[in-house]
Structure formats: structure tokens, C-alpha cells
Amino acid sequence: MSAPETTAPLQPPAAQAASLPGSLAESLASSGITELLAQLDRELIGLKPVKARIRDIAALLLVDKLRAARGFSAGAPSLHMCFTGNPGTGKTTVAMRMAQILHQLGYVRRGHLVAVTRDDLVGQYIGHTAPKTKEILKKALGGVLFIDEAYYLYRPENERDYGQEAIEILLQVMENNRDDLVVILAGYKDRMDRFFESNPGMSSRVAHHVDFPDYQLDELRQIADLMLAEMQYRFDDESRAVFADYLARRMAQPHFANARSVRNALDRARLRHASRLLDDAGTVADDRTLTTITASDLLASRVFSKAAPAAQTPAKE
């Protein structure tokens, strides 16, 4: 497999920033946005088109601030978004960073993220949905409302479903409070497309559609290294090769969830690592032993079992 395309750092190089007009360079330096974009670049492997869109939005808001300072006004841009992609591709993480960026650039007051699903918005009885939806919106004002699997709000097969009531309230707030609230709808691309086809009012209010691609094998290996480093673990040479084999097998099986499956696999490897140390009473508990995931901690996975081929039931991580 060829190496994935290298993602350029999100932050403008120092030389580029210095060449900008004085006020723009000063605004860039004082905004703190460079550090936030660099943090996102470190946290997320790959996702080049996603990072490019975030940088574009940050640039628009920064330039709008400069324009406003000089008396130019184009009105607040609509920044409601739709994030599409498979599980584990970083949608929630990007939404969290987006909230911080929007706050840093003065678009929203608080910069917090409120993440919800249908169950948080839609009631089971008459008169129950409106209060639930309005309470969530009240919490989200000044920040970002992230609605995961948003297409479940609309269930046309059930005439008595109250999801449409929640949608109508959302539409009103998205229009009237768009300078103090950003709504991000998330889910699988095909289902979100059908949702927008059935709800043209929602489609017309969402200006930015960002697709999160699945990770490639090498990117998943890098993600695993980052996750282990955060937990103060490491692979040795043998276990790193075994984990690459594990990923190749697991990616071919059902219900693979990108970075989420990587984290699950590492959590189970940590369990096996701990059990292995306790089972060997003579183990010397030095730093290397306590922090190194070995090949045996990975090979115990059912992914390597011939009894569970990829075409049949999904293996445990």
C-alpha cells in the first residue's frame, strides 16, 4: 500500500505570517488561532480535506474581524455544518475544536460543545418534545450544538412521531440565533443526504458539508502510536508488526470503526498485558515491563483466530 499523502501543517508558516499586511499579521498572532489549528493537526492524523475546510472557516472569520474594524460589513456568515463519515473518523473531536476556534475568533460567546442524539431532543408524549429541545438549545447557545445521527430526528414512517416538532424548533433557532449558535449535524453520508432531501428547510440552513474519509492503514498505525503515548505505553518492534497485521485483518471485517476500533483494540491489549504480568509472579516490574505491549498481548485477539474469518461474525477487538 502506498504511503498516504502528507498533510501540510494547518498553521501558516512563520515566514508567511510575517509577509502579510501588518494588521493581518498582528491579528493572526493575537487571535491564538495558530495554536488551536496546530493542536488539531497534532491530535488528528490525516483528514486533509477536513483540516483545509476548518482553516478556510478560521480565515474567513479572521478577515471578517479586520473588515469590520475598517467599517466593512457583510453580515455574520452562516456556519451551520454537516459532518458525514463512518464511526471513529474524528467528527466529535473536530466539533470540539471547532467550538474553541469559533470562540477564539469571537463568533460565539462561550465556545462549549453540547453533544446530543435524538433521545435528548424528542419526547415520547404530546407536549414533551418542545421543552426538551428548547432546554438543549438554551444550554448550547453561545457555543456549538452537535447532533449525532441527526437523520433519526425524522421518521416519516411514523405519523405520530414527534421528531418533526424538534426539527421545526431547530430551524427557527438556527435562523434567528445563527450569530450565537452553530449547529453541526453528523452521521453516515447516505442517510444524511436522504434527511436533507426530506427536509429542504434544514438543507438550506446548512452551508458547510464536510466529509470525513476512512483512515488508511498507515494512518491507523500512527493513531495507535499516539494513543499509546498518551497512556504512557509503547509497542516493541515485534508487537508493532503484529498490530499492523491485526489492523489489516480487522479492517476487512464487519463493523470496523476506524480510530474507535483502534482504541478498543489497545484497551483489550492493556487488559491482556496486565493479566500477563500478574500471572508471572517472577516478573520484574521495571519501567519497560510496565509500559511495553508485547506481541502476545495482541495475538490473543479473536481477529487472529481461524475460527472467525472476516466474512462471518465480527471479531472482538
Swiss-Prot record:
One Pfam family cited in the UniProt record for this chain: AAA
Keywords assigned by UniProt, alphabetized: ATP-binding, Nucleotide-binding, Plasmid
InterPro entries registered for this protein in UniProt: AAA+_ATPase, AAA_lid_6, ATPase_AAA_core, CbxX/CfqX_mono, CbxX/CfxQ, CbxX/CfxQ_RuBisCO_ESX, P-loop_NTPase
Annotated protein name in UniProt: Protein CbxX, plasmid
PANTHER family: AAA-TYPE ATPASE FAMILY PROTEIN / ANKYRIN REPEAT FAMILY PROTEIN (PTHR43392), AAA-TYPE ATPASE FAMILY PROTEIN _ ANKYRIN REPEAT FAMILY PROTEIN (PTHR43392:SF2)
Gene name, Swiss-Prot/TrEMBL: cbxXP
Superkingdom to which the source organism belongs: Bacteria
Protein task: Seems to be necessary for the expression of RuBisCO.
Residues that coordinate or bind ATP: 85-92
Similarity comment text for this entry: Belongs to the CbxX/CfxQ family.
Organism, as annotated: Cupriavidus necator (strain ATCC 17699 / DSM 428 / KCTC 22496 / NCIMB 10442 / H16 / Stanier 337)
Transmembrane regions: none
One annotated GO molecular function: ATP binding
